[in-house]
Amino acid sequence: MEEIKVNDNTERMPMIGDPAPEFRAITTMGKVDFPADYKGSWVVLFSHPADFTPVCTTEFIGFSKMAEEFEEINTKLIGLSIDSLHSHLAWSRSIEDIDLDGNGTVKVKFPIIADISMAVAKKYGMLQTVAKTQTVRAVFIIDPDGYIRTILYYPMSTGRNLPEIKRIILALQKHDEDNVSTPANWQPGDNVVVGAPLTLQGAEERMASQDEDMVVYDWYLTLNCPTC
């Protein structure tokens, strides 16, 4: 059997719940010390394959249009690819001339990391193509304490669902504020999931509950109506 050789220099891919790997980098808005510079804010750190490419351009226009929406929920955006700073700047300027949907043009007002050395991309497991010469469409949602709460990867051919990224952040914030979970397709104002009881007695009490704010489907599935 052929022996498998392990490269000890390979970065361990971060996982949900891990502290966000630290780095210092040059961006289109100056130097950044991450995550220290963003303590107290949620962060969407996302990578794209390359500047001046069509799918990435639509994503950056979309992120730019939603930038204020993210700010309203205490969330900062940071882009990244292994292109140069000059490439990022030129691409950002060209984006300003594109009216994609007839609703006007936008400016890219969030920083884009110029990760030419691939140091940040390696720390975050963003290099997954065979040649490893492009970053994949990765998304890391990082909380105000600097912990990774969500990791998303998209195929090279598929643009990201930006409203879904915002929805995830809102769901995480709801969880942190009220210690509840959110069901499939949850939107702010919808019913939330109440934790299941951990004992037989608790299960029996849940089934017998007369709480008008709760909808009990079974002992393990209870929804709470936040607007009741």
Model-derived segments and spans:
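Chalcogenol-based redox active-site neighborhoods
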Residues: M1-C228
